[in-house]
């Protein structure tokens, strides 16, 4: 394994050629303040203790690493372990980062939070920690996503957040990020931008990765306890990339194959997909340089996925770098492949995963049979499927797999 891998951003915030701080001058003071505050918090044992306290007592960590016996047997290859991020409070990995950033905001004396959300999971996690720490929260959410995720919108409002519909563009996650950044610029004195994925201007990709790395750290100690060795392969789905970077990061220098699974939407031969790595090229969006779905003129294209959490047109800078150096292999799953995997997995394991996570499972179903029975795969179940029941039901009804 190549030990010459860059695992921290350089002083300008780059991983290789990706990352940086492509923001208006007006935001630079806030970015500098955040970077300094985070550096201090990271080195402060008291901050880390407080974070650990809430992760354990409030979120319910550590999450189990569950051996999927029936699923493993059905695929007839490698042993499959599930990292159960679906069992966190609020039902997904998003809370790991929301909690960490809320504690950081509190430490910085910021009383208000602004966030963006796609599937609504990050919005719910942000609203949850805002309620916990008595902070105000404004959430920007694309109007299209609001339609798809009504239950999560109500959850956020019940928790005390103000949800603002974004009509611009295609009314999805990318447009919500634009609005959240604009809002932050004009409220920077008393507001922290609680960014939900491993992207945005430096230091956000590092902050989000660090708070999500608890996933990979737990996997490492849990698999060593259960199997006495590291896994052969680790699989996670990728939108912006926070659950994946949190899963992969503690294994970057180990001899473990890492697979990120992007959303191929209606297929990689169509223009309705979210393949930032698969079909994208480097460009700048939302304050950072990363792989993007864009046309020849550099116009960012609309991303598509049946999963509201994966239809983002970019993929964080650290993933972009790991792709270029060949450390992480990027695969994909179409809407249909993901939904079929979701149905199959649920019937075998009695766990309904989020559609996002089902993209990772779809690749596991292709990978496991090619490996030996002694091999070990860990797949991150990034969230539970409650929020997706309507989409799943519709999909099954349309195909005659369920009654209307």
Curated annotation (Swiss-Prot):
EC number(s) recorded for this UniProt protein: 4.2.1.20
CC annotations in GO: cytoplasm
Pathway in which the depicted protein is active: Amino-acid biosynthesis; L-tryptophan biosynthesis; L-tryptophan from chorismate: step 5/5
EC top class named in words: lyase
A Pfam family it matches: PALP
Protein's UniProt name: Tryptophan synthase beta chain
Alphabetical list of NCBIfam families matching this protein: trpB
Complex formation: Tetramer of two alpha and two beta chains.
Upper taxonomic lineage: Bacteria, Bacillati, Bacillota, Bacilli, Bacillales
GO molecular function: tryptophan synthase activity
Organism expressing this protein natively: Staphylococcus aureus (strain NCTC 8325 / PS 47)
